[in-house]
């Protein structure tokens, strides 16, 4: 009997790294390939992975700053080495973050087939360490090629970001009906990501009375956990508005939305593309790096509006300008269609060289 193939996935720390890995793990399982996840025993992956039905092995990993942490990091490499020898994976996929580094290093020492997946336009520091060694690096966006030497581009492949299976089949009309949204109502989703965004919350509060005055505007606002004015907002909101720290049905809400106000995290951008959602984007951080580069994926197609932290008032004015402009919203949705990459997990798995010893 042929031994079941096994793929080791490694990353952690944030949902932006973990959820793409879980999407690939889910697809591996469907194909009869065992997935084993190695991450930090202290970060969110220790709960998310087992809850998703996959094997999780926790390693004591810290950012290697200072002599004590460097020693701890070296110990993590030794632990990962033992784990890989015991698990005998046919391939290892790193999804970025410092948590993946000890596992990738141990995999290289054991001559395992190494693959990488990069969620953002800019390649992260962990993946930068290894992409010249990896058999293949899977990219979310074509724009990443701009920073890759031509001679190295054959070892990269654009697949899109693997997204949670819950996104499959979500339809605008169906989700609106489930949420009890009337045909005459427009839906605005406001989210700063899983941790919230104080800048976004503050500017929404500044315009809150105007939002409340529009009786045919349904607001779904994910504030994050540290929003001090949450109680006040809940007292003044319209009856059908939903104001919560986080929505467990976030993808369903996004599918039902007419417009999204959000950051430019890699998965948020990929979900906006897949669900064809017009967006007002307020990226986190510097205008020259990080989330701004992710946002350009949409602005290059005139499929979103992007505002800096110095343009927050302008961002809200644009919300009121286009939320009822059906023609503008339709054009933005159409422009998102060419960017869709719905089979990312499938393409990644198909590219793995795991059938030869």
UniProtKB/Swiss-Prot annotation:
Keywords annotated in UniProt: Cell cycle, Cell division, Cell inner membrane, Cell membrane, Cell shape, Cell wall biogenesis/degradation, Glycosyltransferase, Membrane, Peptidoglycan synthesis, Transferase
| Gene Ontology molecular function: any one | undecaprenyldiphospho-muramoylpentapeptide beta-N-acetylglucosaminyltransferase activity
The reply on keyword Lipoprotein is: no
Topology versus the membrane = Peripheral membrane protein
Location, primary (coarse class): membrane
**CDD domains per UniProt:** GT28_MurG (cd03785)
Q: Give the UniProt subcellular location, in the record's own words.
A: Cell inner membrane
Hey, which pathway is this one from?
Answer: Cell wall biogenesis; peptidoglycan biosynthesis
Quote the InterPro entries the UniProt record gives: GlcNAc_MurG, Glyco_trans_28_C, GlycoTrans_28_N
Q: Which cysteines are joined by disulfide bonds?
A: none
What GO cellular component term, any one, is given?
Answer: plasma membrane
Biological process terms in GO annotation: carbohydrate metabolic process; cell division; cell wall organization; lipid glycosylation; peptidoglycan biosynthetic process; regulation of cell shape
- What is this enzyme's EC? 2.4.1.227
Please name the top-level EC class of this enzyme.
transferase
Q: What parts of the sequence cross the membrane?
A: none
Which sequence ranges form a coiled-coil region, renumbered to this chain?
none
- The UniProt record gives the binding positions of UDP-N-acetyl-alpha-D-glucosamine as 14-16, 120, 164, 194, 291
Family stated for the protein in its record:
Belongs to the glycosyltransferase 28 family. MurG subfamily.
NCBIfam families according to UniProt: murG
Recorded protein name is UDP-N-acetylglucosamine--N-acetylmuramyl-(pentapeptide) pyrophosphoryl-undecaprenol N-acetylglucosamine transferase
């Amino acid at each position: 009997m042929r031994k079941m193939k096994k793929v080791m996935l490694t990353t952690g720390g944030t949902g932006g790294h973990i959820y793409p890995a879980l999407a690939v793990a889910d697809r591996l399982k469907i194909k009869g390939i065992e997935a084993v996840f190695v991450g930090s025993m202290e970060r969110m992956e220790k709960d998310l992975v087992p809850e998703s039905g996959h094997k999780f092995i926790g390693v004591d990993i810290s950012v290697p700053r200072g002599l004590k942490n460097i020693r701890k990091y070296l110990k993590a490499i030794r632990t990962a080495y033992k784990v890989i020898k015991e698990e005998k994976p046919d391939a290892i996929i790193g999804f970025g973050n410092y948590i993946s580094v000890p596992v990738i290093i141990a995999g290289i020492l054991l001559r395992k087939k190494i693959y990488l997946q990069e969620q953002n336009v800019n390649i992260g520091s962990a993946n930068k360490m290894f992409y010249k060694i990896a058999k293949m690096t899977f990219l979310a966006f074509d724009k990443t090629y701009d920073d890759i030497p031509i001679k190295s581009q054959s070892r990269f492949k654009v697949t899109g970001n693997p997204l949670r299976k819950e996104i499959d089949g979500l339809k605008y009309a169906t989700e609106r009906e489930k949420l009890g949204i009337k045909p005459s109502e427009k839906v605005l989703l406001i989210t700063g990501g899983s941790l919230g965004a104080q800048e976004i919350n503050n500017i929404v509060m500044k315009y809150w009375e105007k939002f409340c005055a529009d009786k045919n505007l349904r607001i779904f606002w994910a504030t994050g956990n540290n929003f001090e004015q949450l109680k006040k907002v809940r007292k003044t909101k319209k009856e059908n508005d939903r104001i919560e720290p986080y929505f467990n049905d976030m993808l369903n809400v996004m599918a039902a939305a007419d417009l999204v106000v959000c950051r430019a995290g890699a998965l948020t951008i990929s979900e906006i593309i897949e669900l064809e959602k017009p967006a007002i984007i307020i990226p986190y951080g510097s205008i020259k790096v990080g989330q701004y580069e992710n946002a350009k994926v949409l602005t290059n197609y005139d499929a979103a509006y992007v505002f800096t932290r110095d343009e927050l008032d302008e961002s809200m004015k644009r919300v009121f300008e286009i939320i009822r402009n059906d023609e503008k919203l339709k054009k933005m949705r159409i422009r998102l269609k060419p960017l869709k990459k719905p089979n990312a997990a499938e393409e990644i798995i198909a590219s793995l060289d795991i059938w030869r010893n």
